[in-house]
């Protein structure tokens, strides 16, 4: 968009109550989507790391461990979809319950908690920690992310 168009929009926006807030919310929503897409990508990379470890288990014919890791990989795959496709921090334009900027900031705080757990999962899948510790760490983080996503979704539903 050219500077001329921005200036026109800014001038028009100055005449419309709440325009700036709406613009900021739109920017935050775009950031939120990008943020979640990046985190989903980290989870996908973590899953690929687990798949590489599973190949080692297959070559050593350790089917019991392979099944345990497959369960964890499936949980990770499901969580990737939940993170990627979770509710946006938005409400419809004409809804009686519009999400305000400070409430949208709370949604972003949920996202920050999620990213902390995702980074732990990625580092655990990438590092050569003990196998049992890695499984426990990833499993616990997945449970925490599920809880946070549920709380986040409940919070957003208040404004739909």
Segments and roles (model prediction):
Residues 1-58:
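Leu/Val/Ala/Ile-rich N-terminal alpha-helices, chiefly Sec-type signal peptides and the beginnings
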Residues 2-3, 148-160:
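Short acidic DE-rich linear segments
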Residues 22-25, 38, 97, 113, ...:
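Generic signature of intrinsically disordered, low-complexity segments enriched in small/polar residues
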Residues 49-143, 147:
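Charged linear interaction tracts used for macromolecular binding and regulation
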């Amino acid at each position: 968009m050219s500077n001329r168009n921005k200036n026109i929009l800014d001038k028009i926006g100055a005449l419309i109550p709440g325009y700036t807030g709406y613009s900021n919310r739109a920017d935050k929503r775009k950031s939120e989507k990008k943020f979640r897409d990046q985190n989903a990508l980290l989870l996908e990379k973590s899953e690929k790391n687990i798949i590489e470890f599973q190949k080692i288990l297959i070559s050593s014919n350790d089917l019991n461990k392979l099944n345990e890791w497959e369960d964890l990989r499936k949980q990770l795959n499901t969580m990737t979809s939940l993170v990627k496709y979770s509710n946006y921090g938005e409400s419809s334009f004409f809804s009686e319950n519009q999400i305000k900027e400070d409430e949208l900031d709370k949604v972003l705080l949920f996202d920050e908690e999620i990213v902390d757990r995702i980074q732990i999962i990625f580092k655990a899948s990438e590092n050569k920690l003990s196998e049992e510790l890695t499984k426990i760490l990833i499993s616990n983080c997945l449970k925490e992310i599920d809880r946070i996503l549920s709380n986040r979704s409940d919070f957003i539903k208040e404004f739909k």
